[in-house]
């Protein structure tokens, strides 16, 4: 698991954009993993935006708890849970969630629990 670091600026997404914050090349998406973060730009005068999260596992992940983390500052300890945790995947081992009122400036995924050793691709879209 990569160590969380904010040495380099994060990818920035605006409404209509998406970014991969974890790929299979990053290794297994294991319990306790935090993905890379993204910066979210405002889409005009609106102060809150939409954000969607898609996690595609290479196989059955077992028991999962995936949590969108958001923050107004890019400080690891300032990230907080946004909405309810994702606890299920579909028949293709894909988990997806939408968040309608995100006002934070940064977002990432916390894989609180993943019981099977599987790789994944994680995408965040505005």
Locations of regions flagged by a protein language model:
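Short Trp-Ser/Thr-centered turn/loop motifs at beta-strand boundaries
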Residues: 24, 29-45, 71, 83
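Noncatalytic modules at the cell exterior or secretory-pathway interfaces
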Residues: 48-55, 100-118
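Aromatic, loop-rich ligand-recognition surfaces of beta-strand-rich domains
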Residues: 34-59, 125
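Solvent-exposed serine/threonine-rich low-complexity stretches and specific carbohydrate-binding patches
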Residues: 24, 80-91
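Short, surface-exposed beta-strand/strand-loop-strand elements in extracellular ectodomains
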Residues: 61-77, 121-123
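Exposed aromatic-hydrophobic patches
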Residues: 36-41, 93-101
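Solvent-exposed, low-complexity segments and loops of surface/extracellular structural proteins
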Residues: 2, 30-31, 41, 62, ...
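Short, intrinsically disordered N-terminal pre-domain segments
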Residues: 1-20, 122-126
């Amino acid at each position: 698991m990569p160590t969380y670091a904010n040495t380099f600026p994060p990818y920035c997404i605006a409404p209509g954009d998406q970014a991969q914050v974890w790929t299979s090349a990053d290794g297994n998406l294991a319990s306790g993993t935090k993905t890379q973060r993204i910066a979210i730009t405002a889409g005009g005068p609106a102060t809150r935006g939409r954000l969607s999260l898609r996690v595609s596992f290479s196989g059955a992940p077992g028991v999962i708890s995936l949590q969108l983390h958001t923050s107004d500052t890019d400080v690891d300890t300032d990230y907080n849970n946004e909405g309810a945790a994702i606890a299920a995947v579909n028949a293709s081992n894909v988990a997806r969630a939408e968040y309608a009122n995100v006002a934070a400036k940064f977002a990432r995924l916390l894989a609180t629990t993943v019981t099977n050793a599987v790789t994944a691709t994680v995408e965040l879209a505005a």
